Structures are given as structure tokens and as C-alpha cells.
């Protein structure tokens, strides 16, 4: 099937903002047609393209809003830990229902509730309106995804977060978070050592993530938290 219109297409591009390799992927059709062999191939190619990318541009048609296909592609990028920019195209067209970017952004984030870290840019590919902003954001979110934070600064944030909101408990046993360190970048990945992984509920993990974002930014990139359980005896030996 190589050479079909469903292949991802690489385009090298250079401007005053830097050198880029754009990987233009074919769209994913509606579920009723996804059994078609070519469409299955396009889905596979989308996965492969996302894996190769440093930054993913999720292009949304302003006249349609977030479609099922958009949600699928967003999910692929999020699960792959890629930096993401949401690009709302055709913002210049009169049939765009709501020209209020604040309201429109709210609708987008409601549909993609796990991707509120991604910035939204409103553009017109036809007129070139605000297209240059895309390159500024590409560089910005790429750098955010590569950010490293010292262990000392991380644990200052962690201790403040624990003081502000007490860790959860169950049946008389309370979660103790000993310390946190950064393991890798793209996406920024942090390891938190605690006395009980079972007590480290998703809601408290989200709280810690929000504290990290409030302090350091990490705009445009998912954050991965790895929970490691250690006994209190192990911590005493450290």
C-alpha cells in the first residue's frame, strides 16, 4: 500500500524559528468504515507518525468542533506522552458558530478533559491568520517537554503540597510520600516513593501533577508519575 494517499508524508521546512520536519498523517474515518483495510492502515500509520514526532499538532475544524476522530488522535498522542498543540482551523469562516475563543476553548477542553495542558491556537490556513504562532508554540512546548527539575526543587514543591493537602488514608493507615525525583523527559517523568502505592489514589496523583504544573509550567506536555512503594524500614536505612 506504500504510496497511497493514506501514507504519512514528511515535509522538511525551515524558517526564522528553526528547522522542522512535518509528518502529515491521513485522517481516521468514522467507526462504521474503520474495518476497511486502507483505513486500518491509516490508523496504524497515525500511530507510527505520532511515535516519531516530538510535538503533535491536533488540527480541529472550527465549524465541526471536536469530532470522534479528533478524540481518537488526541488519545494516541496523549498515551504516547507527546507534547501537543491544539490548532483550531477555519476560524475566519462566517459559519463558525461561536467566535468567542474562551467559550470555544472551554468546549474543546470539556471534550478532551485529559488534555487541558495543551495550548489552543486559533488560525486560518487559508488566510495565514496567526499561523506564525504555531511555530512559536512548537518551540515552546518542545522545550517544556524536555525540562528537567532538580530533586531539591521537586521536593520543596512536594513538601509544600503535602502540607497544604494531607495525603489520603484508609483503615487507619495514611499515605506517606517520602520524596520525588525526575527520571526522564519527553514526557517529564517523575518517580514518587511512598509507603503504600494502593493509598496513592489517582485524585492525589492529579493534585501532585497540578502542583508541578503550577510551579514549573510543563505547558503542552503530559506528565507521567511513577509510584514506587517502599517500607518505612527501607526509608530509615537511607
Spans of model-derived segments:
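C-terminal-of-GTPase-core extension/linker across diverse P-loop GTPases
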Residues: 1-23, 31-44, 48, 52-58, ...
